[in-house]
Amino acid sequence: MPLELPPLPYDYAALEPTIDAETMRLHHDKHHQAYIDNGNKALEGTEWADRPVEAVLANIDLLPEDRRAAARNNVGGHANHAMFWEIMSADGGGEPSGALADAIADTFGSIDDLKTQVNEAGVKRFGSGWTWLIHDGTGLAVVSTPNQDSPLMTGDTPLLGIDVWEHAYYLNYQNRRPDYLAAWWNVVSWEAVGARFEAVR
């Protein structure tokens, strides 16, 4: 099946004031759509065209060399953004609960310590990329990736990811990436992140 743009699970303005409606419109309708269009071109005519996105990214080094970079950037971009929309909510913020909260406390000390590590990784990411909370098969970890690289490419499971490409925040925050990262936690859906954790723990 070709890659397809998933609908936003909320209105463009639902995440204001943290993320403004125009940023959401451009980010979803233009940027994400471009990753899909270019990802489909990269996979077209290969044995990977009908494979699940997760399988493509987990085996990115097996793709034809002349398609690999485009697939890495664009299929990765699609996977990253599809998750990004799902883990945000107009009713977001607060703190996690249950097994996820326990795992965060065991690994990082507290939710505030986790936020600090995720934010620091995002601030330190030079240029464009993502900052992540992942499950690496044994437990939780914070990592960052360049461009549209996905933790799926290294066998890890993304639980939470924050886009630190400028297109994700520049209209509202200009060059103030730390402010964007600090504000983003107001829209995180811990319910969605917790469901992702339950699926892999």
Enumerate the language-model features and the residues they cover.
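Feature for soluble, non-membrane regions of globular proteins
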Residues: 1-201
